[in-house]
Each structure stands twice: as C-alpha cells, then as structure tokens.
C-alpha cells in the first residue's frame, strides 16, 4: 500500500507521471487548466533523478555519483525513456523556454555503455531478475542525442544494437526509431571510456 502512495525513485513513477504529462500536453488547448499540471510535472521531474532514497521504506537512492541506477539497465532505461519523452514533448510545446538542467543526464551514456557487453553479434547487457540479456538502452540514448547531447559514445552504443533485438526498441521500422535514430556514420569503432567502472 505504501508503494502505491509513494513510488518516487522507481521507474513506474516516471512512466505513470510522464505519460500523464504527455496526455496533458495534448489537451492543453482544449482544457486550459491542464497547463498548470504540466508545469507542476516539469518542475517536479528533476526530483526523480535526485531521489536520495527513503530509509523508512528501504528504498535506495536512484542514481549514484557515477550515474549508475540501482534498477539495472532494463528498468533504468524504461524510467529514463519515459522521463525524456515528456522532456522532449515539453520542449516542443514551449519553444524558446529553458527546460532547466538535470545533471544526471550527462552521466547516462557512460552508464549504459559500461553495463553492456559488446561482442560479435547483438549487444548484450548486464541485467538482473526478469530482464533479458538482449534488452538495450538505445531508446534513451536516442532521446538524449535528440535533446542535444552529442556524445560520440551514444553513436557507438546505438550502432552496436541490432534492429529488432528486443521487443521495446526504437528501431528504424518503428515510428520512434525512424524519427530519432541519428546518423551513425560517425560512430567511433571503440568508445572513449574507462576500462573499468564501479557503480555503488
């Protein structure tokens, strides 16, 4: 019951709240009162990235200092993807306005790349529980790139993911992949990343 009242820090928070935000953005011309809801969400979104945990509810801090997320790649990608979809929609409906800074976004390309397992064939990822090794984070990487983060590591990562390698991907034969796949011709052969990384 407590989780249903307070899911801050969990990937479902951004899923539920940000999809509601996109719905509100689509209705703001017909229902002026939803503009206030949109702005409340926009102002609250950084709190999800900043969530420091909750000792009483035994909830971990969402992101560590190196940018790692405790829910591993699959669930981190899901929560981040939902947040970035709302952020892009907010920017598109608020031309010229400053969307504000979310410092954790800058560390995500490194995190997603450090928890993948490059190999011959499709990219594998380090996950836990009910996640599959084929799940990747190209959707969040594409949205980060679309938001102006032109990190070559993003291009490398996306170029390693095979088309159709998992069910939730942003692939070229799907609308989001068609719209947001960047030009991968300049993807580096190897990303400029440390050879090891600790997330804690």
Regions inferred by a protein language model and the residue ranges of each:
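Carbohydrate-active enzyme catalytic cores, enriched for enzymes
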Residues: 74-200
């Amino acid at each position: 019951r407590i989780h249903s009242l307070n899911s801050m820090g969990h990937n479902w928070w951004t899923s539920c709240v940000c999809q509601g935000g996109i719905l509100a953005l689509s209705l703001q011309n017909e229902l002026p009162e939803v503009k206030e809801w949109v702005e409340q969400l926009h102002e609250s979104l950084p709190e999800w990235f900043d969530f420091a945990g909750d000792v009483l509810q035994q909830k971990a801090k969402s992101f560590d200092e190196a940018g790692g997320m405790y829910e591993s790649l699959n669930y981190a990608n899901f929560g981040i993807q939902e947040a970035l979809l709302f952020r892009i929609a907010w920017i598109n409906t608020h031309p010229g306005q400053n969307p504000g800074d979310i410092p954790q976004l800058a560390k995500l390309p490194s995190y997603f790349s450090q928890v993948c397992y490059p190999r011959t064939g499709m990219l594998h990822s380090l996950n836990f529980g009910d996640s599959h090794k084929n799940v990747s984070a190209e959707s969040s990487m594409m949205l980060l790139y679309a938001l102006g983060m032109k990190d070559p590591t993003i291009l490398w990562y996306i170029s390693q993911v095979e088309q159709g390698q998992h069910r939730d991907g942003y692939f070229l034969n799907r609308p989001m992949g068609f719209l947001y796949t960047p030009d991968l011709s300049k993807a580096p052969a190897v990303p400029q990343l440390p050879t090891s990384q600790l997330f804690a």
